[in-house]
Amino acid sequence: MLKVGIVGCGAVASLITKALLSERIPKARVLAFYDVNYEKAKKLSEETGAESCVSIDELVSKDLDLILECASVSAVEETVLKSILSGKDVIIMSVGAFANKKLFLNLYKLAEEKNQKIYVPSGAVAGIDAIKAGSLGQISDVTLTTTKPVMGLKDAILDLGLKPEEITEPKVVFEGNVFEAISKFPQNINVSVVLSLASKYPAKVKIIADPNLIVNRHEILVKGSIGTIKTCVENNPCKDNPKTSALAAFSVMRLIKDLSEPIRIGT
């Protein structure tokens, strides 16, 4: 049985927890929760019978095999650092943190030294296995075009000085590189960092707000020595968190299931 602890107890964590309590993932269980808002951890604890912790230190001190981060970019460094030093592998959902090259390299080196694993799920996009394979050749271009409902980008749109209600037709709200994208849209464009890590090539990113769209659309174009990879996924948003695609949560569930089973399909 794979014993899991979760950092961050919002809508996505709740969805993943329900899956881990079901027969869909029979060989893994959540045993402990932590959130900066203790009441959120307590609520999930009461619903599941797992422990609620008052700190990450308390969480990683438990008898766990795996820590799942689904909190925020700002929580990644502490979560990964303390998990690895406590002899635990860790899954990172807020992979936007790895746009910070120094942080990525420091945590990579630490995990290597301690013989622990840092897992990055494929998230809300398709084709990551093929792109990883292609990265062993030569990649010449990586482009991500993400289109989301206006309300799914509301906070980021406001931060840009725009009014969501005034967007009445599809509008490009960002065009630039992966580093700029995750800086301006830290809760909406983690997929750009997953794509860049998989391809080992800094993705070019375009973000479109569409008032007529009800799904989160991610279109990928990768060119390289193996040929051209094109994918398009139209994801339903998480019911309680429209900033996140439901597929992002399901990709974590699948990763945990894979880690708990003797045979793994895909790279």
From Swiss-Prot:
Annotated active site: 218
Pathway(s) it belongs to: Cofactor biosynthesis; NAD(+) biosynthesis; iminoaspartate from L-aspartate (dehydrogenase route): step 1/1
EC number: 1.4.1.21
Pfam families: Asp_DH_C, NAD_binding_3
UniProtKB keywords: NAD, NADP, Oxidoreductase, Pyridine nucleotide biosynthesis
EC top class, as a word: oxidoreductase
Molecular function (Gene Ontology), one example: NADP binding
UniProt entry tagged with the keyword Metal-binding: no
Superkingdom classification of source: Archaea
Catalytic reaction annotation: L-aspartate + NADP(+) + H2O = oxaloacetate + NH4(+) + NADPH + H(+); L-aspartate + NAD(+) + H2O = oxaloacetate + NH4(+) + NADH + H(+)
Residues annotated for NAD(+) binding in this entry: 124, 190
GO biological process: NAD biosynthetic process
Protein's job: Specifically catalyzes the NAD or NADP-dependent dehydrogenation of L-aspartate to iminoaspartate.
HAMAP family hit by this protein: NadX
NCBIfam families: NAD_NadX, PRK13304.1
Note: The iminoaspartate product is unstable in aqueous solution and can decompose to oxaloacetate and ammonia.
UniProt family annotation: Belongs to the L-aspartate dehydrogenase family.
Entry protein name: L-aspartate dehydrogenase
Source organism per UniProt: Methanococcus vannielii (strain ATCC 35089 / DSM 1224 / JCM 13029 / OCM 148 / SB)
UniProt gene name: nadX
